[in-house]
Curated annotation (Swiss-Prot):
Identification of the protein by name: Protein E4
Species this protein is from: Human papillomavirus 31
Keyword line: Early protein, Host cytoplasm, Host G2/M cell cycle arrest by virus, Host nucleus, Host-virus interaction, Modulation of host cell cycle by virus, Phosphoprotein
UniProt record similarity statement: Belongs to the papillomaviridae E4 protein family.
Additional remark text: The major E4 form is first synthesized as an E1^E4 fusion protein from spliced E1^E4 transcripts, such that the first few amino acids of the E4 protein are derived from the N terminus of E1.
Lineage top rank: taxon: Viruses
Length: 99
């Protein structure tokens, strides 16, 4: 038979013939792990001001090609920069950076 205190608190338990008071409390469900690691750095991305943007359009002082040992060239199209290089074995490598 059901515990009288439990039946008083939960009257529908009295309808169950096989109800017995649980001897151990139910196990707690563990808290799920976070989806992403906690962000340590609180820094925010800084937007460029109009003055800084106008300065970035100046011609770079970096050379656009190198010596014959490791030839490479730099080209720009809009907001993209491409670096073309070729190894001594003839392997061609292209690096494209979209700003």
């Amino acid at each position: 038979m059901a515990d009288p205190a439990a039946v008083t608190k939960y009257p529908l338990l009295g309808l169950l013939q096989s109800y017995q008071q649980p001897t151990t409390p139910p196990h707690r469900i563990p808290k799920p792990a976070p989806w992403a690691p906690v962000k340590v750095c609180g820094g925010r991305r800084r937007l460029l001001s109009d003055q800084e943007q106008s300065q970035s359009t100046e011609t770079p002082t970096t050379p656009t090609s190198c010596c014959e040992a490791t030839p490479w060239t730099v080209s720009t199209v809009g907001l993209s920069v491409q670096l073309h290089a070729q190894t001594k074995q003839g392997l061609s490598v292209v690096l494209q950076l979209h700003l």
